[in-house]
C-alpha cells in the first residue's frame, strides 16, 4: 500500500497560505452573523473538540454540540434541524450525511481531510479485505464513506475496546483499519486476534516518549493524558489513555493540578472550561516550529474558520454529498456502533 498521495496532500496543505486572523470586532461580527444564519436556516452547528476555541464556543452559544466524533454522529442524528453544519474534517461530514441522508450537511470547507482517511484508499483497502475473508472488518470512524461501506463495524476511540471485546467473545478474528497505533492499543487491552492496516495520524504520531519523559521531569506532579492514536512508547507513559471525551473526564476526576496532554491542543478549550483551576500543557512533539508537521494541532481542523463557516451558510458551499449507492452499506456498520453504545449506556444506567 502506498502513502505517496497522503504525503503530497499533507505537504501541499501545510505549504498553503493560512487564513488571516480576524480582529476582535470582525470576530464578533462574524459570530453574530453565523448565529443569525443558523436560526434563519433551521441549522445547527456541530464542532469537534479539535476545532479552534472560537468555533467550539460558537457551537455552544447557538445550541449546537461540541464533542468527540461518536457524540457528533449521535447529536446530528437526533437533532431536529434540517441543516447540520459540521466543523471538523470531511469524514465527520460524510458520517452525518450517511446517518441523515434527508438533511443538508454543510462544512466550512471540503478540503479539511484527515491523514488516516488519506492513508486508507478504498481500492487498496478492499483488496486487503478480500485477501482475508475470514476476518470481521472493523474500521475507525476516521475513514471515507466508501471504506465504511466495506466494513462490518465502525468504531470511535471511545467505544473501540468494548466493541472489539464483544467481537472477541464471539470468536471473531478482526481486520482493523486504518490507525496502526490505536489498533495495537486495542490488541494490548483485549488480546484480540487483529490484523492491522498501517495508517497513522500526523498529529499523534509526532509525540515522542523521550521528550515526554523530559517534560515529566520538569513537572513531576503532572498527570500525563494520552490519546491511543499515539505511539506505544508514549501510551506507556500515560496516567490515563482514552478518547477525547475520556481524556476530558480524566482531567476532571484525577486529583492532579497539572496535566501534560498528548493530543490535539484544541481539546484545551473544553478542559479549561470544565477545570478552570487546573493547568494544561501540550505534550512535546518531534520538533518545534518548522521542524514539526502538526505541532499538536491538526492542520485540517484549523481550516474551520469563522469566515468559512459564514460563507458555507450564506452561499450553500461545502455541501456534503455521498453516493446514494453507498449509503445503505455505510449506514449498517454505523448503526451497529450507535446501537451497541446505546445499549451499553442503558446497562450502565441500570447498574448505577
From Swiss-Prot:
Give the pathway. Cofactor biosynthesis; NAD(+) biosynthesis; quinolinate from iminoaspartate: step 1/1
**Co-factor binding comment:** Binds 1 [4Fe-4S] cluster per subunit.
> Which GO CC annotations does the UniProt entry carry?
cytosol
User: What does the record give as the function of this protein?
Assistant: Catalyzes the condensation of iminoaspartate with dihydroxyacetone phosphate to form quinolinate.
Cofactor needs: [4Fe-4S] cluster
Sorted alphabetically, the Gene Ontology BP terms of this entry are:
'de novo' NAD biosynthetic process from L-aspartate
Catalytically driven reaction(s): iminosuccinate + dihydroxyacetone phosphate = quinolinate + phosphate + 2 H2O + H(+)
Q: Where does iminosuccinate bind?
A: 48, 69, 140-142, 157, 227-229, 244
Compartments annotated for it: namely: Cytoplasm
UniProt name for this protein: Quinolinate synthase
EC code: 2.5.1.72
